[in-house]
Amino acid sequence: MSSWVALNIEPDEAIEEEVDDTKEIQIEEALKLYQNALKLHSQGPQFYAQAAEAYEALLSSDIFKYPESISDFKRSALQDSEAHLDDDVAVIDAVETFPEFSVNDSTSSTLLQTIYLSYKNHGQFTLDTLQAFLQENPRTSDKAQEILSQVSKRTHAALASFAEALERDDTDLNLWRRSARLSNALQSYRLVRYCLESVLADDENCLEVRTDQLGLDETFAQGQLRETLQALDDNLSVSQVPLKKPKKALLRFLERQKDPYPYLPALPSHVRDEDPSKNPLAIRASCYQLTPASHTWAAVGDSILQALIDMERDASKFGPGTSIRFSMPESTADLRSSTAGEVADQDQSSHMENGESANHIPEEDVDIANTTESAAPKTLRKDQDASSILEHVDDQSSIDQRAEKQLMESLENQSARQNDATTVQDVPNVDEVEPNPSSAGRKRPSASAANEDYQAEPVRTKSRRTRLRDSIAETSLQSDEVSFDQNKYYEDRLQTYVEADEWMFDTVGPLLSKLGVDKLESLDELRRQSAANCSKSSVERSSNQPTSAVHVLYRDLDSIVKTWDEAKSQAMLQDDTSLTFQDMKAMDNSGLTIFLEHSRKSARKTGLKPSFTDDKVLSKFLKGVNEEWLHLHEVGFAWLKLLLMPVYGKSPVRKNSRSKKWPVMESAYVAFQWPDVLKEKVVQLLVRDDEYIFRKMREQAEQTELQILNHTPQTPFKYTRDHLAYLEMTQTVFEIHLDVYASINNPHSEVDQDTRLVQRDRLMRWSMLARTALSHYLDHGPSRKDSQNSIILRHIWASTFHSNMEPDVHREHILLCLQDLKEMLHRLSILEIHLMNNAMMPELSADAIDQEISKLNSMDFFMKIFTPGSEDPVELIETIEPIVEPSSVEIPEESESNDQSLSQSMVQLKEMRSFLDRGDAMLKLFLWQRLRDAYQAIDYPPKVVSCYLRSVETIIQELLGASYLEESNEHREIALIRWLKSLDRILMKLVTLVLQQSDKAYECLDMEHLRSSMSALTTLTNLLHSFALYEDSVRVGQTPSSSVRGSLSKSLGNFTEKLREMEVRCWILQYTLLKEAITQNGDLFESPLEDRILFLRSVHNALGIRKMCKRSNKQFLKLMKAEFFSLESKEAYESEICQILWDLYGINLSPPGRFLFEHECPPEKLDRSTAIKLVDFVLKLAKRMNIKDLSKSELKSTIEKIQQAIGTTKSSPPLTYNKRILSAYLKSPINPTEIFRAVRGVADLPLVPVPTESAVIAQNGWYFLLGHAALTKFRSQKRLNPVPTTDLDEAITFFRQDLDHATGRWESWYRLAQTYDSKLEEDITWSADKINNNRTELVTWQRNAIHCYAMAVATAIRSAEPTPETRATLSELYTDFGIRLYSSSREPLSMAAFSLADFTRHYSNEESQRMYQGKPFKEMRLYSVWNLARYLLKRATIDKPKSWMNHYMLSKCLWKMFSCDDSVRGNAQRISVDDLLDSLLDAIDTLPQRKDSRSDPIFEPHYKLVSIVHKLVDRGTLTPAEGSQTLMATPLARKVQPPEDKAGWKPYILEVLRRLKHADKSNWHHRMAVRAAHVTYDDTRDTVSAAAAKNELTQQIFTKTMTIQVWRPEFERPGRHFVYTTRYVYFFVSLLDQLNDRANLDQLLRRVRKKQGDFINHTKLWEDVCLTYAKVIRRAGSINEGHEENVFKPIGWEEFVANTARLENLPQLAPGSQVLLELLRDAIELKKLNNNLMKVSLLEDLIADLYSRLYEINMPQVLEQANEENKEKMKVDHLLMASDGAADTPTPPNSAPASEAPAPRGRTKGIARRDVQKRAETIVGRKLTPRAPAAKASVPAESEPPATSEPAAPSGNQPNKTSFEMGQQSDIPQSIQDSADDESELSEIDDEKLSKLAAERKLLFPNLRDRISPDPDSEMSVPASIDGDAADEVGDGDADLNEAEGGGETTVEEGEGEDGEEGDEADLERDENDGDEESLEEGEGNGEDTENAQDMEDEAEEPEVIEGDPPKENASEPEPMET
C-alpha cells in the first residue's frame, strides 16, 4: 500500500521501525500450552484426559505449522511427492519455501527447543497412559486381545513422538535408549540395534565411548547392545562394542533402572526363540485380499481377473507364498450390512500409488482358520499351528510400514480430507449384475461419475428397508389424517387423456378393420397392461403375466424405462445394428465373411436353459479359499473348474468306474445360461491366464497318459469320472476359444492381426489337447457311452467349424463333414444339444446342420450380393427381389424344354428362401437395404418405399418371433432398444420420402402389401402408445418418474424422445397407407373424405394434449395442413385449421370466443407459399368481424405476420403500367366535367389485367384488408398530440397496390380517399404552419382525395351490390365526398385544390399562329362546388335519413348558396329560405339522444340555427316573430320571451346566446360568445358597445393576460380553429383600438408574436396589429407622422450632437417628458419584439417622432444650459490666451466629459435615422429605470432586460441602485405597465444573462464606468440595440415553448365542425380578404396549443424571438437608417 507524506510536516527521526513479533508471540503461546500440558501430566492419571486435550492443543498450535518445524525426513518426503500434490497449493508452497534458519538465532533455538520438548513429553505421556490402562485392566483371557492391541498401538505412537523429538535433538542419549526399549517391545531387532548404536556412535558413526567416565545411558546401552547382538548371533559386531564398564557394584545397584518400561513386552533372549510371525526380519507369506463388488460369480471372477492384472503390473505384491483371501460375507443377506464398510475400505485404499488395485490390502500376518471340506483342492499345507498364529493377530505389524505411515502423515491428512468429501452412495443391489465389471477396479462407468455431480453434500443415505419403513409410516399417517380415494383422484386427472384416446381408437379401429387390419389393441387392454406394469404390487404384477408376444413387448419397454442403467445407455449410444450395413462399401471384406456373420439367428434361447444363479456353491468356494492357502493362479483355476467341470467339479458318490452306464453329468456351462458379464469374465480369465491353465490341463492329460502307459493286466487303468470331468473342461475351453476366435475374426472386428494370430495358435493348442483327452475317453472310458455321447458330438462339431475357419479348406470338405455330422446325429439319436453360452455353436441339431449346408450352397449367390464390387442395380434387383419378395416372381409359360431348368431355378430360389427364414433378421434387413439401394440408383421411389416398409415388417416379425421371446429379460431389453433404434432410423427416412413423393409413393403397393405394412405399423403403434400411457401416469403423479441422473438421465431422455417421435411417424405412415387403401377400396367407405379428416383430427387431439405435435419436425402438422387446405370447403373445420396454424406457426386465427389448446409447439417461420394459401381463409375470418374490432384483435397481428411472409410485390410490365396510369390520374388537375361525369358513374381508368400471383390475392381483397385495417387503426385512436402518420402511409401503399392490380374495387377508392383526408386533417389540425408555409402539400392531399372520391362514386354506381351494408357504405361515401368538397371551398383551404395556376400550358392560336399560355379547362366555380356538395349530401340522406351530420352539412351548403352574391351564384336559381331552415330543423330533429346527464350535448345545429335566423332577421328576410318562432325548434330558446318588434330582437337573441353558452358547461364552444359580442357591437359601434363587446369576449375568449382561449369542439372541421383565432384577434384589436386600451393591446401583441402556428397569415396579422399599436402610441403622445422632419431638419449635426448630449445630462426634464419617455420605450421594445418580421421603417418612424417631440419640449432648458456654459467660458478666456492647441469649438464647462463627446465628422451632414435611434435608446436607458420582474412565486419571474448597460447617475438626483432593485412603476394611468400581471415583455432577458453581460463588459472595458459616449458614430456610444448583440441574446430561443397560448384543445373525435363564415358580419367580412396571397417573410410557429386556460392567466410571460424568424446579418452592427 502506497503511503504519502505531507510536505509541510517534518518527519520524526525518532520513529523506530516496526518489528514483526508474531512468531515470538506464537512461541510464547505455545510455551504456555506446554506448561499447562506438563502440569496436568504431572498430576496423575485422574488428569490424563485433560492432559490429552492439552497436548492435542499444543501439537496443533501454530509453531508446528512453520516450515522450519517440519523434520528433515518429512521435508524430503514432501519434496519427493510434490508431483502428486498439485492440487494442494498450501503444501506445495510450504515445500518450496522452506527457509534456512540459524540455530544461533534466539527465536529459532527457542522454537526448536519447544518442539523437541513437546514431542518428548508427549511420547512419555502416551506411555504413562498405557501404564495406567494396564493397571486398570488386568490380563484376562477375554481381554487379552484388546490389551495386546492397545500395547502395540500406544507403543507405536510413543515411538513416533520420540522419533520427532530426536529429529530436533539427536544428542539426547536417554531418549535413544528409551526408543530402543520401545523398539524391543515392538519386536524389532533392527530398530533396537539402531537406537542402541546411536547412543554409542560418534560423529563418524563408529562405536566408542566418548567420555572417560561412562554415563548411565552409555553403560546401559553398551550392555543391551551386546545382548542384542548375541541374540542375533552377530559375533563380529559384538567384538566392536566397547568393553569399558563401570564397577560391578554400581551396575548391580543400577540394575533396577535398566529397564525404563518394565510393563512392556520384550524380545526373547535368542532370535531362534522368536515367534516367526512377529519377526520383521523373517521371510513370511503375505495375503492378497480380494473384495468382489457383489456376491455373484461374475464379480468374484472380476476380482480374480483384476488381481492377475495387478500381478502383471507389479509382481512385488505377490511374494513367495502369497495367498488369496476374499473379503466377502458368507451369505447374500449379510452383504448389505457390510457393504458400507467395504466402500469405506475401498475409499481409503483408493489413494495408493502406482495403480494399485482397490481391493489390495497387503498383510504380513493373516488369520486362516482350520480348513474344512471344500470344493477347492487342497494343494498347499501349513506346517505351523494355526493357534499360534492366531495368538498374535493384530499385535504386530511391520515397523517399516508404520514408520512410512508416520513420515507420510501429511499426505494422508490430505487424502483424509478428500475422503471426507466423498459422497456415500447407495450400495448396489447384489441381485443386479454389474454391466461392465471388467473395468470396475480401474475406471468407473460414465453414469456413476455423472451421478456424483448431483450429490451436493456428503449424506449418509438410509438403507432401502429403512426408507420403505419410513414411507409406509408416512403413508399410514397421511391416511389417518386425510382419507380420499387415490384411484379416483388419478382417474380424474387421467380423464382428459382417456377421452382423447377413446376418440382416437374408436375412430381409427373401425377404419382399419374395414381393411382387414385387426392388430390395433383395444384401449381397455392397453390401459390394463399399463396399469399392471405400473403397479407397485408384485402380486398384482405376477397375476398379470403377458398372454401374447405384444404384451411381452409392452412389459419389456416399461421395464427399460423404469430400470434404465449403464448397459441400456450404452446400447442407446451405440449405433444400431442395421446402421453397420452403411459402411459395407467402404470396408475391404469378402462377401463370405459378411455373409457368415449374419447368416444365423440369435443363439440365445432363454427358455431352454435356466439362468445361472447358484450362490450357495459360490459361498462355499469363497469360504474354502479363505480357509486354504492358495496362490492366485490356483484360485482362478479352481473358479473355472467350478464353472466348466460337471457338477461343479465334484465326483459323484458312486465311484465305480466299471459301471456300464454313467449318470448324465453336466457342467454349469452346459446346464445353465450365463449372464453376459459372467461369460465375459470367463473368457478374459481363460485368455489372460491361459499359460497356467493350459499347463495344468496338459499335466493332467500327461498324467492320465502316463497312467495308461504304466498300467498292467494286474493293475488295469481305471478311467474315472475325474478324468471325464477334465475332458469336459478341456472341451469347453476349446469351444470357448473357438467362439472367441470367431468373434475377433469377423469383418467388423477391430482386433489387430497379432492378437488374432495369438488366439489362433491358442485355439490350435486347445484343439489338440481336447482331441487327446477325447481319445483317452474313447479308448478307456466306460463300455456304454450313451450318456456321454454329447461330448463326442460336441468335439466333432467344434472341429468341423474350426476347420471351416481356415482359409485353405475347400467347401466340399466342409459339406462332407456336415453330412457326416448329420448322420452321426441320427445314429446317436441325439435330437439337439444346446450350448447357450457359445455364440459360435449355440445349437447342435440336424436343423442347424441343414442351415449350414444351405448357407454353403448359397455362398456364391450371397457373395455376389455382399461383395462391395457388385454395383449393377438392375442385376441386384433381378437377383434379390425374387428371394425377398416371392410375389414378384411370375413363372412364364414356356416349352417343355425349359421345364427342367425352370424347376432347377425354382428349387434354388426355394432353398434360398428357406435359408433366409432360418437365418438372422439382420440378413433379411441387409437384403432389403441392398434392394432399396438398387431402386434408389434407378430412381424409382415407390419401390424404395416398399423396401422400407418391408424392413419395418421384418423387424416387427423378429420382435414377435420365438428368437426374441425366448431370450432373458436383460437380453430382450437390450435387443428391443437396438431394434427400436433401427425402426426410428427407417421411419425417419420413410416418412420424409412418403411426404415428398406423396403422389406416387404407394403406386406399386397392392392391397396385400398395404395390409401387411399397416398391420406391422399398428403393432408398433400399440407398443409406442403403451409408453404414452406410462408417461400419462407419470405426468399426473400416479407413477414415479425415473430417478436416474447425469449421463444416464440424458441417454434415457434421448431414448424416450425417440419413442415419441416414432409414434408420431407411425401415425403419419398409418394415415398415408389408409389414404391409399381407401383409394384402392373406395367401395368399403361411405364417406372417405370425412373418414380421413376424422382420423387426422382424433390423432391430432390425442397427440396434442400430450404435447407431441412438435415431434418429428412437425411433419404430422404439416401433413394435416396440406390435407385441410386441399379441401374445397373449410367452414366445418375452421377450429381445427386454426389449431393447426397455431401449432405450426404460432399465429392465432381463432375468432373471439373460440379457445385454442396450447400444445407447446415452437413456432416456425411462415413461408411465402403457405402465407398465400392462408389468404382466402384469413379473409373469410376477417369479413365476419367489424373492421374496428379487427384492428384490436389478435387476428390483426396474424395478418401482419402473413403479409410479412408474403413480402413486397414483384414488379411486372402490366403492374408498372397501371401504376403510371394511377399516379397520372391522382396528379391531374380537377376537371369539373370529369367530376360531374364521375358522379353520374361514367368515369374510369384504362388499367390492364395483371397476370401474377399477387393479382390473385389482390382480387380476393388482401391488400384492401391490410389498407383498411391500417386506416382504421389510425382513425380509431384518440390523439392528444400530433402522431406519426406511418399507418396512413401503409394504408395508402396497400390501397394503391390493390388498385394497381386492376381490381376495380370501388371501396378501395373510397378508403384511399379517406386516407388522404386523414393525412390532410392531421396536417392542419394541430398547427397552422402548413397552411401558412406549405400549402402545396395540402393541395395535393385535397386533390388526391377528391379524385379518389370521384372514382369511388363512379365505380360504385357501376359495380356496387345493392345490399344494405353496401348502401350504408355508399351513404358514408357521399357524406365524406360532400364534406370534402365543402371544406376545400372554405377557409383555410379556400378553393386551392380547384386552382389551375400550376397547370397552365402553352397553346398555339389558330388565327394568329402564335403561342400563348392558358389553362387546360375552366376552373370549377365556388358555387358549383357548393352545389355538387349539396347534391352528394342529399344522396347520402336517402340511405341515412337519421344522420344529423348530413342535414347539418347540407344546411351549411344551402346557407352559402343562399347568402352568396349574384356574381358568385351566376345564373343558378336562388335557394329558398324554407329549404334552408328545413335542413337545419332536420339536423336538430335527428340529433342523437344524450347517453346520460354527464355527456355534452351537440350544439352545432342549435347554434347554426340561431346564427342564421339572426342574420335573416337582421337582413329583413324574416320578421322577429318568424325568427323567434323558428328558434322554438331549439329547446334553449323556448323559455325566452319572444320579441314583439325589431327593437326587442337584440335582447332576445342575446338571451338565447346566453342560454347556449350556459348550456356549454365545458366551455368548448366559443362561437356563441363571439356572436354575442358582434350582436352587441355591430349595430352602434360606439365606445360603450365596444366596451360591452370587449367584456363579452374577455369572459371566455381572452383572459386578463390576453391569452386566447379557443378550444376545438368535437365536430369542428380541421383547420377552422385557426380561422376563428385569426378573426377573433382582428375583432378584439379593433375594440382595443377604439377603447384606446394600450396595456391590453401590448399583451395581446406579445401573444400574437409568440404563437405563429395559431393564426392564418400570421405575418399579415402581426403587421396589422403592430400598425394599430403604433397608432395607439401616437394617439397617447399626440404625435403626428413626420414630426421628426419639422424638428431636426433645421439644425445641423454639431448642434444635434451637442444638444442631445445636454438633453441626456439634464437633471430635470420638462413636464410631460415622462409620458414621452414611456411611449418611447414601448416603441423601442416593439421594434425589438418585431425582430424583422415586418419592415422596421414604420417602427423607426414612430421612434424618431417620439424622440423629436421629447427633444422639442426640452429645448428651452437645453438652450438655457448652453448659455450658462458660454458665460462660464467667457470668464476663463483670459486664462487660456497663452495656451497652445486650443479647441476650435469652445466647450462649455458643464458639458459632458471629453471621452463621451463624439468625434467630429470631418464634413457637415444631415442627421441620420440611426443617430436618432441611438439617442432615443440612450436617453430611455438613462432617464427610465428598467421594469422590475413580476414577483410571483408560482411561476418564474419574468424580467425585462435593459436595452443598454447600467446608466450613469446623471447628477446625483437618481438613486445609486440598479434598475432591478428599484422596480419603479410609471405613474401614467394608461401606461403599458398597467397590465394584469404588472410586467412588460418587449425586451426581457434573464437576470443571469444580464449579470453575465455586465460582467463581460466590465472585464473587456474595465475603465468604462456606466457612461456612454455621445459620439453617434462610435459603436460603443450606446449599447447594442435589438439589432445588435442584445438582439442575439434575446433571440437565443423560445423561453416559453411549452406554454400553449391562444390555441385550443384540438384533440377531438372524428367528425366535422362549425363553419365560421358569417355572411353579413360587416367588419369581419371586410377584414377577411385574400391575405394568404401575400408572400411575406414568415417564421415557423411553435404550434403549441392551450392546455389550461386558468394556468395561462396566472403564468408570467417571457418575451422571445420566434424560432424561424429570418436572422439578421451583422447583428453586432447598428442598423443603418435612411435619412
UniProtKB/Swiss-Prot annotation:
This is Histone transcription regulator 3 homolog. Residues 319-467, 1780-2019 are annotated as: Disordered. One of its GO terms (cellular component) is nucleus. Residues 334-347, 411-426, 1852-1863 have a biased composition (Polar residues). It comes from Aspergillus fumigatus (strain ATCC MYA-4609 / CBS 101355 / FGSC A1100 / Af293) (Neosartorya fumigata). Residues 380-407, 1808-1817, 1888-1910 have a biased composition (Basic and acidic residues). Has a role in a nucleosome assembly pathway that is required for the integrity of heterochromatin and proper chromosome segregation. GO terms for biological process: chromatin organization; chromosome segregation. InterPro entries: Hir3/CABIN1, TPR-like_helical_dom_sf. The gene is hir3. PANTHER family: CALCINEURIN-BINDING PROTEIN CABIN 1-RELATED, CALCINEURIN-BINDING PROTEIN CABIN-1.
